[in-house]
């Protein structure tokens, strides 16, 4: 318990009291809007020099404090004298300023943690989407059970504001944040319904992403704290990214609560071989032990979300399955563990007997049906996977049309190059190649056969060969066995920070 109290005091000492004054700094809004909005919105003519005016921000904040919230309803939002006709623009001004300011202490904390761990150089690689798959290849083949969990949302933003107060001691800033959220829309409606929170996320993407990521980081910090305290093996590799917040500080008599109410519960969670992976709005929990322990963790997550974050989590969104008999989706891939059985004949003296050997291998398969559905939605093919032309691109030059198709094909090839079976990937590339040819033929008002005969089918679109083969052919001879082996094996790219729009994980 001494260690618990020391860490709590150390976490509180890191809190800063400087956020509210930063809202009135001009460079904050210049940083937020230099690339996204027209600067004329914020410029005022002051002599010969033009600078970002903070009069708009100060006037908005003053009116927010003078507003009578009991008179205005959600239906009168369009007639709100505070927002007027510039409601959307000025609400984005404040929200972007909030997002920039509130990210500063967390970014400084992350930078100091990375410097202490001396992993600054590898931090960019750790951000890659593909960095998760080598980890799964090494770990998941040893596990027996997996739980695919959907992170519940939306969460009431007042809960997030209260949690933020444990990180940063700045009462005026949080009062202003509450006022802004109230003026933006009806507080209860856009927080408790998916349609309203979707509207909020589109109009205020930076602030919404920060609040959502903070919510995820908060529950993960609690999860990792319990896991580290209850396990024989510590998760040293993850300590640098998730600060453990001691959430029982909200209760009185901290020592008594931890000693009495929680010491017995921790005995259910002792498992040195349990792994947690989060991606987008889902997470995966894998374990080698019996499903009894997985059920314990399932109930733990449900009570954590309901008791601490006051968000409802339905039990059916957390499924526990045997890994060898179940496949699940992860970042656009289908994952399952294939068991290979082999028989070895052994002989000892004059006795001969057979030995069965079972070898597990992680399979990552390209989901061909969701990809074809995404291609059909983007008008590259029909629902059956037959390529069609893209008439909306016919006004572009031939070079631009080919370049667009090549970029899509190259991005998909890079993203799915870690697949165990490349046949589905080749089909996707065939659809894009033929769709490109049909688009060019449509532009030149010709048939596909006549267009290929006139332009030459061998020279046209030769860049549709994978970029990996061209690069590897420069390193190894074309008849090299190493090149053949690399083409069959998986290649992960540690520079992929975003998934392609065609990658559908639903």
UniProtKB/Swiss-Prot annotation:
The keyword RNA-binding applies. GO terms for biological process: mRNA processing; RNA splicing; tRNA processing. It is found in: Plastid, Chloroplast. Pfam families: Intron_maturas2, MatK_N. Keywords: Chloroplast, mRNA processing, Plastid, RNA-binding, tRNA processing. One of its GO terms (molecular function) is RNA binding. It comes from the Eukaryota. GO terms for cellular component: chloroplast. The keyword Chaperone does not apply. InterPro entries: Domain_X, Maturase_MatK, Maturase_MatK_N. Belongs to the intron maturase 2 family. MatK subfamily. Usually encoded in the trnK tRNA gene intron. Probably assists in splicing its own and other chloroplast group II introns. PANTHER family: MATURASE K (PTHR34811:SF1). This is Maturase K. It comes from Medicago truncatula. The gene is matK.
């Amino acid at each position: 318990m001494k260690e618990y109290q020391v860490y709590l005091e150390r976490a509180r000492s890191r809190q800063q009291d400087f956020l509210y004054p930063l809202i009135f700094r001009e460079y904050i809004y210049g940083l937020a809007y230099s690339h996204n909005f027209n600067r004329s919105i914020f410029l005022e003519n002051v002599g010969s020099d033009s600078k970002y005016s903070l009069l708009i921000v100060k006037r908005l904040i003053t009116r927010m404090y003078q507003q009578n919230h009991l008179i205005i309803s959600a239906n009168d939002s369009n007639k709100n004298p505070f927002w007027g006709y510039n409601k959307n623009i000025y609400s984005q001004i404040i929200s972007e300023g909030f997002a920039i300011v509130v990210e500063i202490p967390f970014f400084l904390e992350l930078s100091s943690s990375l410097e202490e761990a001396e992993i600054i150089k590898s931090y960019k690689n750790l951000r890659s989407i593909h960095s998760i798959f080598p980890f799964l290849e090494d770990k998941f083949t040893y596990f027996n059970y997996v739980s695919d969990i959907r992170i519940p949302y939306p969460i009431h933003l007042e809960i997030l504001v209260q949690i933020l107060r444990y990180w940063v001691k700045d009462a005026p800033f949080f009062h202003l944040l509450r006022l802004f959220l109230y003026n933006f829309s009806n507080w209860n409606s856009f927080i408790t319904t998916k349609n309203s929170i979707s509207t909020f996320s589109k109009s205020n993407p930076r602030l919404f992403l920060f609040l959502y990521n903070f919510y995820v980081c908060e529950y993960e910090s609690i999860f990792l704290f319990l896991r580290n305290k209850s396990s024989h093996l510590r998760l040293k590799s993850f300590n640098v990214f998730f600060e453990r917040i001691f959430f029982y500080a909200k209760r009185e008599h901290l020592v008594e609560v931890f000693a009495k109410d929680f010491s017995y519960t921790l005995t259910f969670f002792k498992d040195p071989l349990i792994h947690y992976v989060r991606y987008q709005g889902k997470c995966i929990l894998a374990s080698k032990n019996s499903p009894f322990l997985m059920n314990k963790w399932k109930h733990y997550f449900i009570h954590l979300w309901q008791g601490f974050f006051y968000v409802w989590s339905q039990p059916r969104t957390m499924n526990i399955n045997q890994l060898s008999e179940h496949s699940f989706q992860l970042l656009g891939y289908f994952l399952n563990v294939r068991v290979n059985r082999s028989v070895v004949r052994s002989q000892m003296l004059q006795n001969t007997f057979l030995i069965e050997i079972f070898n597990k291998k992680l399979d990552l398969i390209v989901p061909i049906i969701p990809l074809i559905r995404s291609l059909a939605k983007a008008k590259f093919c029909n629902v059956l996977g037959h390529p069609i032309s893209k008439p909306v691109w016919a006004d572009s030059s031939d070079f631009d049309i080919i370049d667009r198709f090549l970029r899509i094909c190259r991005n998909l090839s890079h993203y799915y190059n870690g697949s165990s079976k490349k046949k589905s990937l080749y089909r996707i590339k065939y659809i894009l190649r033929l769709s490109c040819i049909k688009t060019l033929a449509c532009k030149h008002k010709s048939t596909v056969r006549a267009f290929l005969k006139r332009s030459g089918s061998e020279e046209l679109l030769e860049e549709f060969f994978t970029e990996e083969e061209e690069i590897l052919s420069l390193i190894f001879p074309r008849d090299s066995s190493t090149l053949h082996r690399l083409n069959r094996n998986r290649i992960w790219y540690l520079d992929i920070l975003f998934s392609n729009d065609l990658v559908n994980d639903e």
